[in-house]
């Protein structure tokens, strides 16, 4: 059975799972869902009700980082293989974006929901992105001239 990927096109976690599958040349059946109308088939295999969900015959991966790890178990062509220190840095950056950046981004984009000043949160997001830009420059990618998962 070809794995089935349940995804939502604008979800950043689903986006990074899709990107990893594409970079690793992994084939799957893509099922785009609407978050307000989740298919029963998806909820049967993952009761969390969040995307992404990658369904195999005998297992289910319902966290984007697990999907990325699975996709990269075998080296992908033209994708940078991390050294130990690069892998640690990449995990730190993923954590930064999943926690601190996401926190401020939500409060910037949806300030009326949170009753916060969007300008303060926009400034925090900008600082995080500027620090990332310093790590990248002058290279096109974080770890040099080769594309990587980060």
Indicate where each model-derived feature is located:
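GST superfamily/GST-like fold recognition
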Residues: 145-150
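GST-like domain detector, emphasizing the conserved glutathione-binding G-site
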Residues: 1-133, 137-138, 142
């Amino acid at each position: 059975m070809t794995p089935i990927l349940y995804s939502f096109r604008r979800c950043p976690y689903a986006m990074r799972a899709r990107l990893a599958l594409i970079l690793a040349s992994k084939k799957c059946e893509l099922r785009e869902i609407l978050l307000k109308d989740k298919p029963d088939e998806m909820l049967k295999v993952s009761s969390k009700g969040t995307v992404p969900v990658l369904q195999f015959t005998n297992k289910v991966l319902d966290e984007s980082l697990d999907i990325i790890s699975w996709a990269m178990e075998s080296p992908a062509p033209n994708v940078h293989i991390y050294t130990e220190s690069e892998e640690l840095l990449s995990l730190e950056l993923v954590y930064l974006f999943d926690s601190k950046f996401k926190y401020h981004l939500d409060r910037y984009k949806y300030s009326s929901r949170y009753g916060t000043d969007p300008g303060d949160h926009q400034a925090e997001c900008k600082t995080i992105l500027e620090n990332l830009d310093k790590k990248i420059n002058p290279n096109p990618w974080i770890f040099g001239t080769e594309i990587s998962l980060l």
